[in-house]
Amino acid sequence: MIQFDHVSKTFGKNQVLSDVTFTIDQGNFVTIIGASGCGKTTTLKMINRLIKPTAGEIYIGGENIRDKDILQLRRSMGYVIQQTGLFSHMTVRENIEIIPRLSKADPERTRTRTLELMDLVGMDPNQYLDRYPTELSGGQQQRIGVARAFA
């Protein structure tokens, strides 16, 4: 669960977020949409502590993110941005498995999870895992970005 409790963010004199409160229950998919400059990216960057709130508290799993080790916090989450951010020199499999591999996750569990995620995003692993991002459509790249975020 992610919870924002009366979060505000100001850059100089520019108030980007004002007294934002919401809860995202575990397992939910959430899309943040809005006009340019309304605070979407700022909100995401506050969740993983790239930006500190001016006021309010943010909790993940009931724990204040300020009390969490920043590296562990960032490694424990993934989110999909508008640009896919896939590594063009890596295959789809390598893109999905990069974070688990860097985190020294069990290789067999990682392979199994990759297959599960390909199913989740509706892409045949036999057809796509050995392809490179440049061989995929924009929508397919976005789905691989979703799979990587959940890896």
Q: Where are the language model's segments positioned?
A:
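The feature captures the beta-strand-to-loop junction immediately N-terminal to the Walker
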Residues: I33-A35
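Helix-to-loop junction immediately C-terminal to a conserved catalytic motif
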Residues: N48
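Conserved ABC transporter NBD signature motif
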Residues: G56-N64, L73, R113
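ABC ATPase NBD coupling module
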Residues: N64-G78, L102, P107-E108
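Short helical segment in ABC ATPase nucleotide-binding domains corresponding to the A-loop/adjacent helical element
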Residues: R93-R101, R111, L115
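Conserved ABC ATPase "signature" region
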Residues: E108-Q127
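Conserved ABC ATPase signature
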Residues: R131-L136, Q140
